């Protein structure tokens, strides 16, 4: 209890003041004895995701169509969109905050490389240099309307060592009520006000919460459930009929497409995970036409049907867009689009991840997928403090032999193919 009281004081925006440990002494003893020697810092995000997902009610998430995005899907999106240190980024359905955290990792590595500093494993308690801290504090945001998910993401951000104050408990879709929500909820203000104030600085104009000036947006919005409230539907082009009146209901993910485009500045780019039907159904043609009017379609990457198992077998694709802009993305009618399909399932039919029988440089299992090149050959093990030189040399030799053994680990993946395409197309965010 004393440790928990200290934690509440230190991390006020993660734990409420009146929070109690809701376990009996005997159950608490079992948990502590099992977890006391587990190191979360410098751990594997995949493992931590699996653990933290149990903290979010699975049945309620399933009803909302919300599922944590596998880290390898996140990494593919981040690599393809190539966020920069001077660019702002947001996830409008942030869940466990995978997209923001991995965007931080990607940008931090570029900052360390630029400064000639060797980057350690970034998911650690090690204090980051001021430039990295400033980037997170001013540029990276997450929004989610599931309070448990927000708290989980704050915990993950805390473990990752980045700024968790910009993870906000808000309804991205119902932006008209943000100010009303903030004004009437003192508890909300205590936890989220500073992050909300920074978010407001990125609005296109004051006193409105529709249009923002983000450079990069990545999101995996909930698929299940329709929005039926006419007040909300009336605020969206995709929520109206041809005569201008609100439709009776619209899929939640459909409104997220429009909402996300409104969050981007002209020339801004985004990746959004969508159900495959949005790309194929004849009844969804109006959605595709709306997208083409607002942005350039950069790429469509079909994910394997097992990616979101065991929670759902829904077939999904990732849509990559860049908002039209006279300078960064001049509007045109005829242009090339990158298409790719994930061939390696990454999970079996029961939803268990498929791994290579080898560990990476941080002793983490490597998931078998073809979304990007893992570059294990350039990420060799680091000598441990209590490890002799002989033991270290042996470990490196075994590591190199394993990497050489699995030839498909040497192949470029979908992300690398897109980067080559983007450079050939002279896309603004991949210009050398």
Which positions does each model-derived feature cover?
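Short acidic-aromatic active-site loops that bind/stabilize oxyanions
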Residues: 41, 63-67, 245-250
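Residue-level signal for short amphipathic helical patches enriched in basic/charged
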Residues: 43, 84, 303
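Membrane-interface junctions
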Residues: 41, 76, 80-83, 263-266
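Conserved S-adenosyl-L-methionine
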Residues: 66-198, 211-212, 216, 224, ...
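S-adenosyl-L-methionine
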Residues: 46-68, 79-82
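Proline-centered turn/helix-capping motifs that create local helix->coil transitions or kinks
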Residues: 40-44, 112, 222-230
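A conserved structural/catalytic subdomain of Rossmann-like adenosyl-cofactor enzymes
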Residues: 175, 181-184, 188-432
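Long recognition/docking surfaces used for binding and targeting
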Residues: 1-58
